[in-house]
């Protein structure tokens, strides 16, 4: 137990750990309370055109090669964009060094699956400030599907009326052609293809 942890004290020398992209630094702690405490500055940057768009990249992850899409997407995101990330999908990009915009890191790690709540709180707060709906914000949701937790995130977003969600790299096995048609018609959900598209 705890006595063993105290006694063994870890590695005898520094033991570097890297993320999936080889990065050795990860900045975390950007749940809604941290982001919203800087909302004034973020809103100013949006109004000044210094932040042109916000991407939320998150969801469940897996080992399939197509999942590099999320890393590639983050790397290709223009320098005047922020990336909110959460859940296991964040490990595809949270060790990238993409710089900052006026002191705000371009990658904001909001936490795990349950912290999708934080991303929703931030989106709703921004919509209130700009007197618009979440769908009218300069915001794109890029969700990675792998297991049931991602369904909870997706259903929550759909229940809030959020549209234009990008979903992939594969679709849930239980989504029939008819269900997919309804999702596309009512919510304009799109299956991811290539980063360039």
Residue ranges, per PLM feature:
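Charge-patterned, long linear interaction tracts outside catalytic cores
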Residues: 26, 41, 136-192, 196
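Gly-rich Lys/Arg/Thr-decorated short loops/hinges at beta-loop-alpha junctions or inter-strand turns
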Residues: 10-30, 51, 105
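Hydrophobic alpha/beta core scaffold segments
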Residues: 38-136, 160-165
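Proline-rich intrinsically disordered, low-complexity coils
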Residues: 12, 16, 65, 78, ...
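Domain-scale recognition of functional cores that engage charged ligands
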Residues: 20-42, 67-68
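Short, small-residue-biased leader/transition segments that mark boundaries at the very start
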Residues: 1-6
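Glycine- and other small-residue-rich loops at beta-strand/loop junctions that grip anionic moieties
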Residues: 28-34, 57-62, 111, 142-146, ...
């Amino acid at each position: 137990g705890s006595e063993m942890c105290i006694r063994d004290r870890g590695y005898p020398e520094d033991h570097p750990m890297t993320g999936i992209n080889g990065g050795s630094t990860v900045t975390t702690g950007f749940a809604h309370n941290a982001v919203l405490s800087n909302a004034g500055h973020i809103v100013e940057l949006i109004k000044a055109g210094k932040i042109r768009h916000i991407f939320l990249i998150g969801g469940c992850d897996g080992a399939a090669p197509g999942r590099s899409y999320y890393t590639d997407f983050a790397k290709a995101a223009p320098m005047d964009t922020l990336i909110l990330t959460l859940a296991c999908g964040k490990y595809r990009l949270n060790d990238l060094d993409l710089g900052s915009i006026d002191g705000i890191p371009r990658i904001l790690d909001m936490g795990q699956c349950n912290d999708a709540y934080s991303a929703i709180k931030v989106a709703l707060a921004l919509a209130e400030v700009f007197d618009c709906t979440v769908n009218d914000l300069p915001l794109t949701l890029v969700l990675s599907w792998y297991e049931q937790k991602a369904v909870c995130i997706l259903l929550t977003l759909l229940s809030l009326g959020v549209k234009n969600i990008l979903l992939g790299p594969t679709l849930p096995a239980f989504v029939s052609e008819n269900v997919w048609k309804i999702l596309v018609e009512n919510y304009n959900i799109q299956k991811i293809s290539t980063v360039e598209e």
